[in-house]
Amino acid sequence: MMTGNIMDYLEWYGDFDFSVLPFNEVDNLILAELSYASLDRIVPEPQLGRKIEGVSVSEAASRLRASGRVERSCKLEQNAGFLLYEMAKGKRFSDAVLGAYVDKHDFENQEQFSALHVYLPDDTIFVSYSGTDDTILGWKEDLNMAYQMPVPSQEEAVEYLEKTIPQDGRKIRIGGHSKGGNLAIYASVMCYDRLKRRITEIYNNDGPGFLESMLEKESYIEIKDRIRTIVPETSIVGMLLEHGDSYEVVKSVSKGIMQHDGLSWQVYKNGFVKLDERSKESLVIDDTLRTWIMGLDDEERVAFVDAVYELLTKAGIRYLSDLEQYKNVMLNNMAKEMFSLEPDKAKMMRRITRALISEYGRNIVKKIRGDKREKDNGI
């Protein structure tokens, strides 16, 4: 069985138009990953009066290549740029139109938000919400979801959907990867009813869940059957918080947290390679984080998240790539800042971190005992 990833899929099926090969789950991931590309001044912003103004995928790819920015970008944006180049090669996507591009970073309100529309040749619209980028700011907002709803990007996602979608009756698919998947669901739940009726599918590609109160909303229950949550076998991000929908598990060629990268997900023909269940590693981490988070009250969650963010920013870390590129310097800076934290904050961080490590240890022991029982019983 020959398998590949979304890049290979574009090579295999890039010249199949949507009348021959209808929209599928792999197309969803391609368009979800596309929103990570740096398309400022390449794809038009939302227009007044919901006017559709955009550029074709082939034109956007030409402009992006001419700008030279892909080579200067972080890996996440680079991969999305290369994906756009590949999309432009075949008739499946080359004439699709990109528009309503937004890319916003608000450090004061701790918000990172990016999205775009893809007007497809099958006369549908795909609204793609970007996940968390390389900034510490973006990850801070993700962590805020552990105690806050809505976070600024969730509110922005609803406003974006309601104000930018043309009122022409076309059917809409909405999706995103990582935090983008969470935003896709949130916007679909909270938008006005007439718009909601046009939404046919909502794709959450390894995105975090919600606080329990979200799942109890009538508006969530109403659209629940239109949600597809897709996660890799060792999903970590996609298992955070609560999910009211079932999920599909896909094979990944990467290990651990690196499976979060959608380019590692395995594709066979026009679908993902599916598995029956998540890996034992994912289950252990899920149990650990779930028990640990539930053991913290809202005040402790806020204090811990704020302390981690303060530690990173004071150490001069603005991007995750800083940690990789200047690892020794940054770790040294973090150690210095740890000692400069107020005594109460430092004590709180040590206590909560110890609780996390302890819970992980307990779950590892449970896994080992479970494996032994299965072996003894010949399972």
Residue ranges: model-predicted function:
Residues M1-L116, L120-I125, Y129-A146, P150-E159, ...:
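Alpha/beta hydrolase fold serine-hydrolase catalytic domain that processes acyl esters and thioesters
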Residues G175-G180, A184:
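Gly/Ala-rich beta-loop-alpha elbow adjacent to hydrolase catalytic centers
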Residues A184-D193:
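Short glycine-enriched nucleophile-adjacent loop
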